[in-house]
Amino acid sequence: DGIVAKDGVRAAFDLYYPSSDSVRQALAADFADQMRQIGIEVSPRGASWDDIYPHQYSSPVLWGWGSNSPVELYQLTHSKGWGNYACYDNAEIDAHLDQARAARTVENSYEPYRKAQWDEATQTGVAPQGASTWVWLANIDHLYFQRDGIAIAQQKPHPHGHGWSLVNNVDQWDV
């Protein structure tokens, strides 16, 4: 059937997504199609969040993350992060993240955050060339309507559907 196997174990897993979310359903189906092309069987499983949570540490889930804050990097990849569903535990990465959070200025946090993502010197990090603790599938574009006479300032990328990123710089709008 084209699915690769090693020692009798097929490269196959379930991928959970909230059945109430048609975008995640489509992403799960497309991801499964792409993985099949390289010999991996992904079975999308639509369910309620109550039914998904028991699987959050044992099976992939199509989460909807996204934030312009590095706090999210900490929560998703630090061994003590509440969103570390991959159960990733690396003392070096934890040290970088702890150093970044303890920095006295935002500027001083940049380098340890970068090293947590990828440290060329040690060849470690959570980015795709390293541990790749998350598979980033897509950034969803947001569509906003704008009233004539309002000039909305330059926007940075907007994360997942909550957070009201649109108004982060409302003080720079020209009304």
Task: Report each predicted region and the residues it spans.
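Detector for C-terminal structural segments
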Residues: 23-33, 52-175
